[in-house]
């Protein structure tokens, strides 16, 4: 039986590299992802337009994924959202400014209507299963 008090931290990108920021936190039956960024390809990656995090871990546990929290609106933190939300369509929490940036991006990809973007005001706390953010 798994220890339900153990916090698992799973980096899907952004460690030891510039860009592709995405960190997953898992506690019992709840998963929260922080950021969803892209990375621009290295020069030797001919024909590749952008690099996104491997979200297999999230897709395989979709029933446990409560949300994606966005720290700020830079591409290395929001750029992969149009690609990730196609398979992991969960609420996305962000500040008002970041909401505007994400909205434009999702509209360009024709995903704005089916996406669940939520604004978090300064000082506001949100409850996501066992997580408080």
Give the residues covered by each predicted segment.
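A short helix-to-beta-strand connector/capping loop
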Residues: 4-5, 111-116, 129-131
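Short acidic-hydrophobic, aromatic-tinged amphipathic segments that line or gate anion-handling sites
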Residues: 116-122
């Amino acid at each position: 039986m798994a220890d339900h008090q153990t916090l698992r931290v799973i980096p899907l990108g952004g460690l030891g590299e510039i860009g592709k920021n995405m960190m997953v936190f898992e506690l019992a039956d709840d998963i929260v992802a922080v950021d969803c960024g892209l990375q621009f390809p290295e020069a030797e990656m001919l024909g590749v337009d952008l690099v996104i995090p491997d979200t297999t871990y999230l897709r395989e546990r979709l029933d446990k994924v409560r949300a994606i929290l966005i720290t700020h609106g830079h591409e290395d933190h929001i750029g992969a959202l149009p690609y990730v939300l196609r398979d992991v369509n969960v609420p996305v929490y962000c500040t008002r400014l970041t909401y505007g940036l994400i909205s434009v991006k999702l509209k360009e990809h024709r995903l704005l209507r089916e996406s669940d973007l939520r604004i978090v005001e300064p000082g506001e706390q949100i409850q996501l299963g066992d997580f408080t953010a």
